[in-house]
Amino acid sequence: VLTSVLALLDSALAQYSAVRPGSEFNTSIRAAGLDVENTIYAMQARYQRIAGDHSAALAAANLVNLAVLSVMPFSDQAINPIHDLSNRAGYVKPRDTLRLTAEAGDARAAYHVTVAAIRGNVRPLDNFAQYASNSSSIPFYYPGEMRLIGAEALTNLGDIPGARAAVNGVRTKCGGSLNEPKACLAALADTLLDTAPELLAE
């Protein structure tokens, strides 16, 4: 299956690069907020990571423009399915462990969830912070995700200093105009990120 997925992504990128769709495609076919090329690169990075091709995963992650978000848009007519299942039906909600197990001061927890303390069968439940309305968009990828894929690939390729810099780049990311989770944490000392197990755990 992975081979087929990667082949489809390679084909999609080749066709998109060859044609470079014009205004008709961009205004009438492409969903608003979708960046086709960056999304293909991000999917290649994800699936190459799963396939264990660290060099290819790193190469694809490095091609993603981290200053660009790519999202799936929704509206009151085409409702965000996570919002629908979580807010209207109440079937899907995040467990409070996402928030409680986060490192102290990690701003990504509050980006993703809001405290609700709803009684669940196993754990108390929170609410999704990012899917509070019918029209909330769903990102195809986050820039920080691409940085972490790169960090993992660098670790597995033996580049500990490069991986450490990538991990700390994610930890210290704070501010900016993009709607993305930002940790706003301090960088970790080199001595805490000087082995592959430490980097992969982080």
Question: Which residues does each predicted region cover?
Answer:
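Membrane-interfacial helix termini and the short, flexible loops that connect transmembrane helices
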Residues: 98-99
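Acidic/polar-rich alpha-helix caps and helix-coil junctions
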Residues: 1-93, 103-202
